[in-house]
């Protein structure tokens, strides 16, 4: 079972709630909140995994079953914060901030800076060859999460991480000649492809 669907439905449900039956939206929100925050979030790891067993929601010891995508997890947490605000559930916002801080600490490259694209929850080799690349969208979504976490809770760790992300992004992704960003960096933060994001 894949994290992508319940994760994106957390956001999509708020975007289209004016167009769809309220009962369906409310049911979808509750189902997706449960999936994201109770099934894919692994409390003992402090992380969200990308895949669990479709049979019993357990962890699977395979490439897919060990995969952690820090950017995906961090993006989901600002969706959860929006839902927490919409539903009047501050405890949901607090939990999202806690997960976000745990995830960014885990996903931050301690040697070169930036957030890894993919990681293995057991520290084993990755199937994805691009696992150590630094992608623009991962950093943008993470920055949104951190500034939103600070705005909603006043948590100073979120503000510090936002500043760290801001500095990294404007130092590494920005094209020095034109007001655009490169989309893909290597692990060291050097432009990997001249494509713009």
Which residue ranges define each predicted feature?
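Glycan-recognition and catalytic cores of secretory/periplasmic carbohydrate-active enzymes
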Residues: 1-197
């Amino acid at each position: 079972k894949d994290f992508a669907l319940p994760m994106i439905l957390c956001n999509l449900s708020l975007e289209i709630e004016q167009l769809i039956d309220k009962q369906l939206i409310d049911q979808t929100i509750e189902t997706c909140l449960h999936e994201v925050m109770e099934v894919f979030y692994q409390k003992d790891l402090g992380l969200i995994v990308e895949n669990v067993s479709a049979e019993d929601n357990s962890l699977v010891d395979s490439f897919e079953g060990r995969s952690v995508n820090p950017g995906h997890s961090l993006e989901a947490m600002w969706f959860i914060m929006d839902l927490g605000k919409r539903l009047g559930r501050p405890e949901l916002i607090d939990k999202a901030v806690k997960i976000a801080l745990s995830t960014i600490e885990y996903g931050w490259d301690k040697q070169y800076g930036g957030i890894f694209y993919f990681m293995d929850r057991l520290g084993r080799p990755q199937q994805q060859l691009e696992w150590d690349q630094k992608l623009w969208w991962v950093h943008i979504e993470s920055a949104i999460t951190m500034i939103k976490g600070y705005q909603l809770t006043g948590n100073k760790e979120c503000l510090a991480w936002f500043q760290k992300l801001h500095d990294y992004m404007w130092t590494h992704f920005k094209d020095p000649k034109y007001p655009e960003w490169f989309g893909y960096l290597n692990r060291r933060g050097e432009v990997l492809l001249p494509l713009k994001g």
